[in-house]
Regions:
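Conserved, function-defining micro-sites of small-solute handling proteins
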Residues: 1-105
Length: 105
């Protein structure tokens, strides 16, 4: 079972959770670079530009697609979009974490 809302490109025969046991369950993962608070915006912009350049390389994109990674358009690969994604994930999962009594150790 896959927890995404779309079939895996590498194994499209595997049904999604929404299609089988858990309607409405959609989970995804994402990857990001983080820097210490107070890092100058110019450094953040330089690091982001390098990451976008690497992720725009056709060979890199093909390999990531081959292993089933969802790829985003360059305009979606910004600190602002990441911040919005983090905020949405926190708003979605925090009530569940709290209700389950999950605590960091």
């Amino acid at each position: 079972m896959r927890s995404s809302n779309s079939p895996a490109t590498v194994a499209p025969e595997i049904p999604t959770a929404d299609e089988t046991a858990v309607p409405g369950l959609v989970m995804s993962s994402w990857h990001a670079f983080f820097v210490p608070r107070g890092t100058p915006k110019e450094i953040i912009a330089t690091l982001n530009a390098a990451a976008v350049k690497a992720l725009s390389d056709p060979t890199v994109r093909a390999r990531l697609t081959d292993i089933g990674q969802k790829l985003y358009a360059p305009e979606e690969l910004t600190p602002e979009v990441l911040g919005a994604r983090q905020k949405a994930d926190i708003e979605k999962w925090w009530p569940i974490i709290r209700a389950a009594g999950i605590r960091a150790e």
